[in-house]
């Protein structure tokens, strides 16, 4: 699947090349462990996640510009096991349908402050591994960064790795994958956080 994505024969994640690499590496700790994506879009990130797990669940309301069927068709064509949960990320029906604890969650749905914070507050209880928040430090969506930083300040979650436009959160200070990344790349280390970003660092880090 990865080769087909690299050849542009399948949708790719809406990420920079560095962020795609970090996304892939951070999932490598959780081979065939339950994973969840909230906000599927065209399915590029979900396909990348399927490289690491056969226990993948996808939440989307499908009321944006992309339909569900092309994504569904890809997973059926390549016989990738996946469970679709249709609905808004914050809806009670969607939350009630979640029966798993996930090792990796990719949040890429809400871009407002309230929506991002609500997703983090609701979905962190379903995760005992890593949460990746997409569009962190993305200038188009500043409220994502603000909401994520406020969530971290008021919870036991830590920012352990910051890429171009995404951040990885964990209750731990490090994961095996984040340690390997630290050894491979020139990074900025501050308060146990690893920064690989050309964006403005979070305000509490600047200070």
Whereabouts are the PLM-identified features?
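S-adenosylmethionine/decaboxylated-SAM
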Residues: 8-13, 17-207
């Amino acid at each position: 699947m990865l080769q087909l994505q690299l050849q542009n024969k399948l949708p790719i994640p809406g990420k920079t090349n560095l962020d795609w690499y970090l996304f892939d590496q951070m999932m490598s700790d959780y081979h065939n462990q339950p994973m969840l994506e909230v906000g599927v879009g065209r399915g590029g990130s979900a396909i990348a996640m399927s490289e690491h797990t056969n226990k993948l669940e996808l939440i989307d309301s499908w009321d944006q510009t992309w339909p569900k069927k092309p994504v569904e068709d890809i997973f059926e064509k390549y016989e990738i096991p996946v469970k679709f949960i249709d609905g808004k990320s914050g809806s009670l029906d969607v939350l009630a349908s979640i029966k798993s604890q996930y090792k990796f969650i990719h949040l890429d749905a809400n871009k407002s402050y309230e929506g991002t914070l609500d997703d983090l507050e609701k979905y962190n209880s379903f995760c005992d591994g890593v949460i990746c928040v997409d569009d962190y430090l993305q200038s188009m969506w500043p409220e994502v960064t603000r909401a994520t930083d406020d969530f971290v300040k008021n919870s036991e979650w830590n920012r352990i790795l910051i890429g171009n436009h995404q951040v990885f959160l964990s209750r731990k200070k490090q994961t095996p994958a984040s340690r390997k990344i630290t050894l491979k790349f020139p990074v900025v280390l501050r308060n146990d956080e690893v920064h690989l970003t050309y964006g403005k660092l979070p305000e509490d880090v600047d200070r």
